[in-house]
Design a protein with these regions (language model features):
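Auxiliary Fe-S-binding modules of radical SAM enzymes
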Residues: 17-132
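Radical SAM/AdoMet-radical enzyme domain recognition
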Residues: 1-6
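Active-site beta-loop-alpha junctions enriched in small/polar residues
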Residues: 8-12, 39-41
């Protein structure tokens, strides 16, 4: 078995500096692969998250909001595929580079991840008819 970890969510301006330490701890625990996902704020989560920030991190609220807007084109979230999980632009590139460097230093993602359906067993259950 090849353990992996997914650092999720990366909250820009709040938890992004923790990436190298998290990857080191994951590597020390045996992780061989890692990934990350930026904070996603679809639908009503924006207001909930902003209220949480105001209550628990009022001094960093504006920094987080500015970083989110830099990732998602002046919005707090963009649901576009490939953009929603990483963002785009210089700050997204900076986080991606920090992640790659931390992976290289810890030996994570050193080998390619090979996925296989070799051990999948089809349950051979026939789809039930909705209108029976």
């Amino acid at each position: 078995m090849r353990p992996l970890t997914c650092h999720r969510p990366v909250i820009p301006g709040l938890t992004d500096p923790e990436i190298p330490e998290i990857l080191k701890l994951a590597s020390d625990a045996g992780a061989k692969f890692a990934g990350y996902v930026m904070l996603r704020l679809p639908y009503g989560l924006k207001e909930l998250f902003l209220n949480w920030l105001a209550e628990y991190f009022p001094d960093r609220r504006q920094k987080v909001v500015n970083r989110l807007k830099s990732l998602f084109g002046e919005k707090l979230y963009d649901s576009t595929f490939y953009v929603r999980g990483r963002g785009k632009g210089p700050y997204a590139d900076q986080v991606a580079n920090m992640f790659k460097i931390a992976c290289r230093k810890t030996g994570i993602n050193k080998e390619p991840l090979h996925l296989s359906t070799e051990h999948f067993i089809n349950p051979e259950i026939i789809q039930l008819n909705l209108f029976d």
